[in-house]
Design a protein with these regions (language model features):
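Charged C-terminal helix
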Residues: 4, 55, 233-269
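Conserved N-terminal subdomain of the carbohydrate kinase-like
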Residues: 2-9, 29-112
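Conserved phosphate/ATP/ADP-binding segment of small-molecule kinases
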Residues: 120-197
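Phosphate-handling active-site elements
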Residues: 32-36, 198-199, 225-239
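Nucleotide and nucleotide-moiety/phosphate-recognizing core
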Residues: 89-97, 186-189, 195-197, 228
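N-terminal basic/disordered segments at the start of proteins
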Residues: 17-33
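Short, small-residue alpha-helix embedded
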Residues: 145-146, 208-232
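Short pre-catalytic strand/loop immediately N-terminal to key active-site residues, enriched for Gly-Thr
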Residues: 10-16, 198-212
Length: 269
């Protein structure tokens, strides 16, 4: 049996390569983990916009999940873009049948350019079917508000939102502060709530548009570390360092919200 850690991403494809499945697999590779994938949607997008979304038929999603379960030893996996309530319920049903290890749920709802990636009707399905299965959830501020109704602006409101999510079954909540209305602040703060501890992670806030795929990359790095057997707290801290390096060393690709730099963290080591 191989000693190489294996991880899975269940998400949408980004033709521009900056987010989704493409960002996840790049991150897995950079963190020394063999990556597998289940594609839930094919998007036509670049750094400027999302032009088309084609959701994958449920039977094809089920077949992909079975193919991975039958042949790979997955020790951690992440879920990104699912798009519809039907896909959410399809994936949740499969997760009750197959064991893929620790689940990191990135509740993808809106693309960096503003295009919706999750139907509003699917938010209830996300809360009902996937939150109880999640070991870690990584919402940004708009996603945290959509899931809980709480507008996170400080430590107190972050704790309120986290308590709601944990009451629904999530073990660890990471609320990402990059979308803060106080974006003039020089610091970007994330709030972390585990079953036994709570703490914040801070990094410089960079004035850059090269942030496409940051959420995908952050959760993918966390998933890769968990696949290697790292503790949840250490996986979160490594993911924070990884994405900070990726944002602070932009590639300047494209004419809009450009992708992050997946080589940056390794190059600084």
């Amino acid at each position: 049996m191989s000693k190489v850690a294996q991880a899975l991403t269940i998400a949408g494809s980004d033709s521009g390569g900056g987010a989704g499945i493409q960002a996840d697999l790049k991150t897995f590779q950079m963190r020394g983990v063999f990556g597998t994938s289940v594609i839930t949607a094919v998007t036509a997008q670049n750094t400027l916009d999302v032009f088309d979304i084609h959701t994958i038929p449920l039977q094809t999603i089920q077949s992909q999940l079975k193919a991975i379960a039958d042949d790979f030893t997955i020790s951690a996996f992440k879920i990104g873009m699912l798009g519809t309530a039907e896909i959410i319920e399809c994936v949740a049903e499969a997760l009750n049948q197959y064991h893929f290890g620790t689940l990191v749920l990135d509740p993808v709802m809106i693309a960096k350019g503003g295009a919706p990636l999750l139907q509003q009707s699917a938010v209830d399905s996300l809360n009902t079917f996937l939150l109880p299965l999640a070991d870690v959830i990584t919402p940004n501020l708009p996603e945290a508000k959509a899931l809980t109704g709480v507008e996170v602006i400080d430590d107190q409101t972050a704790q309120q939102a986290a308590q709601i999510l944990q009451a629904r079954g999530v073990k660890t909540v990471v609320i990402k502060g990059g979308h803060s209305a106080h974006s003039q602040s020089a610091v970007c703060r994330d709030w972390v709530f585990t079953p036994s501890a709570q703490f914040t992670l801070e990094s410089p806030r960079y004035a850059t548009a090269q942030t496409h795929g940051t959420g995908c990359t952050f959760s993918a790095c966390m998933t890769a570390e968990l696949a290697k057997g790292v503790s949840v707290e250490q996986a979160i801290k490594t993911a924070k360092d990884y994405i900070t390096a990726a944002i602070s060393h932009p590639l300047n690709i494209g004419h809009g919200h450009g992708p992050t730099n997946h080589w940056a963290y390794q190059n600084k080591m």
